[in-house]
Amino acid sequence: MGNRWRKLAWRCWVVVLAVAAVVIPVASAADTEASAVPANLVGRWTRTVTAADWKRAGATGFVTSFVGPYTMAVKANGKVSIIDFTATFSPLSGGRLSIRGVPVCYPKKGLYRWKVANRKLTLTKLKDTCAAEVGLFTGVWTRA
């Protein structure tokens, strides 16, 4: 009976370790996925995206038909609600941030410079290979 219990105990430990190996990294990734953004970046922002914005970004296809006003809500944890999806702003040093989570761009992320002055948020592309993300985010946003 002792040998049987040892096998059972061993199997239980294997299951526990397997579950821990999956759950712990997922929880850690979720915790670090979005980090706190500066307070002056938090809030609701609006801007009108034009056909010229899409053209400048080099966008083609269906996204170029999405012209008009957009509102994004930036939360303190870096989550950004825009259109019908949630992107993530991750602050970096030197007034820069990375943007990721745009469905048509996934898993790519873009690098942008940001500045807030006089209730205006300016996002400037530094490096981003996804034209849809560039066309949507690059430009001047007004605090709503």
Language model region names:
Residues A51-L136:
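Contiguous, well-ordered beta-strand patches that form the walls/edges
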Residues M1-R6, A18, V37-A39, R47, ...:
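Intrinsically disordered, low-complexity regions enriched in Ser/Pro/Gly/Gln/His and often acidic
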Residues G2-A30:
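Secretory targeting and sorting signals
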Residues A30-T46, D53, A73:
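N-terminal helix-cap/turn-to-beta initiation motif at the start of protein domains
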Residues T142-A144:
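Short, solvent-exposed mixed-charge patches
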